[in-house]
Amino acid sequence: MRRFHFTSPGPLAALLLLTAALSGCAGYPPEYLWRVLTWGDADVGDVDRFPARTLQASPRPQHLPQALDDDAVQRAFEAWRPGQRLDALLQDTGTQAFLVLHRGQVVYERYFHGASRDTVVTSFSVAKSFLAVLVGLAIEDGRIGSLHDPITQYLPELAGRDARFERITVHHLLRMASGIRYREVSFFHGDNARTYYHPDLRALALQHTRIDGEPGRHFLYNNYHPLLLGLILERATGERITDYLQRRLWTPMGMAYGGSWSLDSKASGFEKLESGLNARAIDFAKLGLLVLNDGRRDGEVVVPSVWMQAMLEPTANAPDDYNAGMPWMAHHPDVYYADLWWGLRRNDGLHEVAARGNHGQLVYVSRRHQVVVVRNGLRYGIGSMEWMRLAEAVAAGLGGR
């Protein structure tokens, strides 16, 4: 999202709200206009602004053993950035938490800017990767028939607006290749602002989505996709998203602490599927461990391995211009997007994968090197892709020991 510059939510914001209502924004809910004007760009403080639904700590918590080795992690980092200190970079980039796990043990755990292990941090788009796992569980439970189901099977009102929605499948949403329009522009009219601040995300997704292209033709990062997937999940399971997460994933994974999922508003009560999962960094690391262990915890199946593998694979037989809507990817030819997960291709198929979020939130998983890297931060501090490259270097350095 782009930053909106306003000085305070006082008389100036009230005047701007009135001006907005008189200048083409009258169709937006006042609460939406107020949020855009007074909250500005999405930031980590939003965990305290949005209402939320609570997650309880697992009664069978998974406590991660420690074998701290800061020097080994520093050496791995220095191979990538010679002569630099990792802790200095983390401090300078607004990092709150940085954790490294190797073979299931915590080998590095540092906190900055007043944060500690008890600090609850917001996921931003890391939440999308949790959502992908939930979709796989709903398929396993028989609540969603298959990836190839048309989304109108669960959201028939979309077909009433435009019959072309019938051609979009659940998998198109997971791959962010639906052809649904998504435009990032400044101020109220951008889909980036709408999908983040709107107080009724169900209505937004069902009534205001438009189709621009052919399903499966192009990848375009689009926050309507997780909203629609959340609606499908909600209707298919008959449960609130947070409740389904609690029962099928949070508790079985052994989350040692509680958390929450931010809601669009108290009145609507719909989870912010695109961004709003809030937890401690040490529990976010368990998502990475779930990937490392092919969906198992202590030998018990939490998520079927077939889903864990399929969810992380690059798109097969993609057109040559599949990523044309994301031109920055041309500079990173090894980068791909799977089912709400990012990846770095490897020739032998054992790809590096990551859940990534705004301001540099990261859960990076190297199955080859048995490493998980978690970073939470106040801001990016360095380029967005640089956090993946840093984690890649740390994983390679530790894996070579």
Place the predicted regions along the sequence by residue.
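Short active-site loop at a secondary-structure junction
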Residues: 89-99, 112-157, 161-168, 214-221
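Active-site-proximal alpha-helical segments within enzyme catalytic domains
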Residues: 225-232, 276-297, 306, 361-377
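Active-site Gly/Thr loop motif
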Residues: 255-262, 313-372
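Bacterial N-terminal signal peptides that target proteins for export
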Residues: 2-13
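Active-site helix/loop module of the DD-peptidase/beta-lactamase fold
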Residues: 122, 141-180, 210, 235-274, ...
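N-terminal leader/targeting segments and the immediately adjacent pre-domain N-terminus
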Residues: 10, 19-116, 140-144, 393-401
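Active-site SXXK
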Residues: 104, 122-147, 173, 229-233, ...
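Structured C-terminal helix/loop/strand segments within mature extracytoplasmic catalytic/sensor domains
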Residues: 26-34, 352-401
